[in-house]
């Protein structure tokens, strides 16, 4: 399935995807899938991002904020994310072009709206668990069918009004769970083979290198610059996904 040219291509794509994630905290699966699907099928592309997404988010999860505290706050989202990932992967077996197009439109629209409207949307504490469950269900469905979990998971976490460090750890925990659930869902639907697992694991290496370089730049950003970078990445990712779908 993979020759030397394909391996080189995968390395370059995941190096760039890792760099994007290092600077903004998100984007590795979406960026990688957007480019990979230009050269190979979406089913292969989705399978390849599982291990890089899982391992890079594991690295990002550890920081100054206690993980247990984040899990307690996010558990409704994580539960429904798990359940609906299987439904989304079932859709991937058949057809996911429309969902992919919709995903790209929503991402770009939200990013553009948030940049133009300076006031950040903030979710009140009393609505967090309900909206977390709804977001998890939607994220699992989109992620399982397109391999891209950034909508609406990143948008939900961003709306919780966290510090930069809290956001990075929280989104990493959510996305590491999403990658793990995606792997289970793909396996259950016979979309993940041992060969794809091996190449997906290899793809984590250039992802880590790119992420390391990106994190060196990230720590030089202040909160406002970081948020602008994050929102700009949402727009770019959305446009890439739209291009992939049409």
Protein language model regions, located:
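Juxtamembrane helix-boundary/capping and inter-helix hinge elements in multi-pass membrane proteins
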Residues: 38-43, 64-70, 158-166, 189-193
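Transmembrane helix exit motif
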Residues: 59-66, 89, 93, 97, ...
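Selective hydrophobic functional segments
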Residues: 48-97, 180-224
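Hydrophobic alpha-helical transmembrane segments in multi-pass integral membrane proteins
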Residues: 45, 87-88, 140-148, 182-185, ...
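Selected transmembrane alpha-helices and immediately adjacent juxtamembrane segments
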Residues: 1-39, 121-171, 178
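Structural signature of hydrophobic alpha-helical transmembrane segments
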Residues: 6-7, 37-54, 98-107, 137-147, ...
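Cytoplasmic-side transmembrane-helix entry/capping segments in multi-pass membrane proteins
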Residues: 70-80, 100-106, 126-136, 166-173, ...
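Residues within membrane-spanning alpha-helices of integral membrane proteins
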Residues: 11, 50, 104-107, 111, ...
């Amino acid at each position: 399935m993979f020759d030397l040219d394909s391996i080189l291509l995968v390395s370059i794509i995941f190096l760039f995807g890792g760099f994007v994630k290092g600077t903004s905290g998100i984007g590795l699966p979406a960026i990688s899938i957007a480019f990979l699907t230009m050269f190979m099928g979406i089913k292969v592309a989705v399978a390849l991002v599982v291990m890089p997404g899982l391992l890079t988010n594991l690295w990002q999860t550890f920081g100054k904020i206690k993980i247990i505290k984040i899990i307690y706050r996010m558990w409704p989202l994580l539960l429904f994310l798990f359940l609906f990932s299987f439904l989304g992967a079932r859709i991937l077996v058949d057809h996911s072009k429309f969902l992919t197009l919709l995903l790209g439109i929503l991402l770009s629209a939200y990013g553009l709206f948030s940049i133009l409207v300076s006031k950040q949307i903030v979710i009140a504490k009393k609505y967090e668990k309900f909206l977390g469950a709804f977001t998890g269900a939607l994220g699992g469905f989109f992620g399982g069918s397109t391999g891209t979990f950034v909508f609406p998971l990143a948008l939900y976490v961003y709306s919780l009004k966290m510090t930069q460090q809290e956001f990075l750890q929280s989104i990493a925990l959510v996305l590491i769970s999403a990658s793990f659930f995606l792997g289970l869902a793909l396996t259950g639907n016979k979309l993940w083979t041992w060969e794809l697992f091996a190449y997906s694991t290899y793809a984590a290496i250039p992802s880590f290198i790119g992420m390391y370089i990106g994190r060196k730049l990230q720590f030089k950003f202040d909160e406002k610059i970081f948020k602008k970078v994050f929102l700009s990445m949402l727009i770019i990712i959305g446009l890439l996904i739209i291009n992939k779908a049409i």
